[in-house]
Amino acid sequence: LGNTYSYEEVDSFYERVKKDLGGKPFTIAAELKYDGLSISLIYEEGILVRAVTRGDGQVGDDVTANVRTIRSIPLRLQGEGYPRELEVRGEILLPFSEFDRINAERSEAGLPLFANPRNAASGTLKQLDPAIVASRRLDAFFYYVPAQPDMPDSHYERLMQCKAWGLKVSHAIELCHSLSEVHHFLDHWD
């Protein structure tokens, strides 16, 4: 996984990967980055058992009760073939329409407004009352599944498998076979 912020960084990343692989063919899963609250979900036998924020990188907050109120996160995976234990990582987001609605309600009540959707999502997920969390209509997108024996080798295939199990994956993801395809993806979303 690599984050890039300019075409020059993309080109440099692509050439570095090409060199590291000794010229062997490879693909890149190009996708947009979401700016939300990082979350890690654990499913056991297809059932959501734990949701933890990234916290300080070592220790996060257990927000399982609140995550269970987010409609876009399945409490039980769909279909079959999922591993006994599955970890997926993603971002919890507050859509702009919800952000505006919540701030309008806060303004009417004389409460301080949230500065931005990311801070509002973070504050919402840490609420002690899951009913408040449910009322704010958070959303989630998943972007990473650690490699494991029961899953496909490629990042892209793992995400598509998770999508088949009902986890929300960005619609803005494309499997690119060349640097020009990566540029085309960037041009489309720029």
Model-derived regions, located:
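RNA/tRNA-interacting regions in translation and RNA-turnover enzymes
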Residues: 1-190
